[in-house]
Structures are given as structure tokens and as C-alpha cells.
Regions:
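Signature of Gram-negative outer-membrane beta-barrel scaffolds
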Residues: 1-81
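Transmembrane beta-barrel domains of outer membrane proteins
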Residues: 13-17, 75-79, 126-130, 173-175, ...
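Intrinsically disordered, low-complexity regions of eukaryotic proteins
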Residues: 16, 27, 33, 102, ...
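Membrane-embedded beta-barrel scaffold of Gram-negative outer-membrane proteins
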Residues: 85-87, 91, 114-170, 174-184
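Acidic glycine-/aspartate-rich tracts in secreted/extracellular proteins
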Residues: 93-96
Length: 187
């Protein structure tokens, strides 16, 4: 088979500094995804021929998937002191069927081409601090990622939209130099 995926995007992001302590980030992104997959039926491809009983070896079928999305991001940062910040952010994203075609994953087939795109919302609250005269960076964040139209492959090998999934998490990080001779990176 032959698969071709194309994407076009336009992205705008602005950081608005109200004063040295408060910064607002606002962004919008438009994505246009296009995937085309052409399959040539072969005499030994029993599964494909079984799905299309009238197919003969050498016949070709082409499946297309074209979608476009508008996604957003917003964040606010408070810097109580110069070496530390507290932030909150919100972002959306989308993942249409076939966008990852050609990289060894699902691509597009007649069975999944009409599935709904996965849509994601991510919220995060975190803090970042530079300590030891800016030699060490400490970070901590809690986050929630909510996905609608989640795709999953069942025991029978078919892919379907299974509804909503949610991930709640915490992320901790340490990066920098503890002393002139000791460096640390963990997270």
C-alpha cells in the first residue's frame, strides 16, 4: 500500500506582560490534515479480499481523510519574586484518523475512516524556582488531560471510539548544579 499524509498549520501566540509579576499567554492554532492511502489487492491478502469480496488481485482502492481544527491555549504566570513563578494553563488539541499514517501505526482503512477525531483538553497548575544562585531549577506541576472520542483497538482487532478518558498526574523536576562538581537532572 501507499500512504501520504500532509498537514498545514498556522499558529499565533502572544505574551502580554502586564507588569514584571504578571504575564498572560494566548494562542490559537489552525491545522489542516490530509491523508490518502491507496491499497493494491494481492492474491495473498486474504483479510483485505475478505473485507471486499468482489476485489480481484491488482485492484486498487483509495481512502481519503481530510479534517481541519482550531485549537487554543491560554496561560497566566505570576512571578512573586524574580527567581520563582506560579502558573496555570489550558490547551486543546485534536488527532484525526490517519494523521499518523505511514509511521507504522493505524493509518486509515475503510473500517476506521469514519471514526470521530480524538479531542483533548489539558489543564496544568505548576511552579518553577531557580535556587542556589540560579544553579538549580526546581519544578512541580499537577495536570489533568481529558480526551473525548478516544480510539482503542479491541480484542477482536477492530478500532473504535470508546468515549472519554482522563489522566490526572503530578510532575516533579530537578535540574542543574548542586555544587561546582555535582550536576543533577531528575524528573
Amino acid at each position: 500500500y501507499n500512504i501520504e499524509s500532509k498537514s498545514k498549520s498556522v499558529y499565533f501566540l502572544d505574551s502580554i506582560e502586564f507588569n514584571p509579576q504578571w504575564i498572560l499567554d494566548l494562542g490559537v492554532r489552525w491545522d489542516d490534515y490530509s491523508t490518502e492511502q491507496t491499497m493494491t489487492y494481492g492474491a495473498r491478502n486474504a483479510a483485505v479480499i475478505a473485507a471486499t469480496p468482489t476485489a480481484q488481485a491488482g485492484d486498487k482502492v483509495t481512502i481519503n481523510n481530510d479534517k481541519d481544527f482550531i485549537n487554543y491555549q491560554a496561560g497566566i504566570t505570576f512571578k512573586p519574586v524574580e527567581n520563582g513563578s506560579i502558573y496555570a494553563s489550558y490547551a486543546t488539541s485534536a488527532n484525526p484518523v490517519g494523521v499518523d499514517g505511514g509511521d507504522g501505526s493505524e493509518g486509515i482503512t475503510a473500517a476506521i475512516n469514519n471514526l470521530k477525531p480524538e479531542e483533548v483538553r489539558t489543564m496544568e497548575l505548576g511552579t518553577k524556582w531557580d535556587v542556589l544562585n540560579d544553579k538549580l531549577n526546581l519544578t512541580a506541576a499537577i495536570f489533568r488531560t481529558e480526551k473525548t472520542n478516544t480510539r482503542a483497538t479491541g480484542d477482536d482487532g477492530t478500532t473504535s471510539n470508546i468515549g472519554e478518558t482522563r489522566v490526572d498526574g503530578i510532575e516533579l523536576g530537578v535540574n542543574g548544579n548542586i555544587t561546582d562538581k555535582w550536576a543533577v537532572s531528575a524528573g
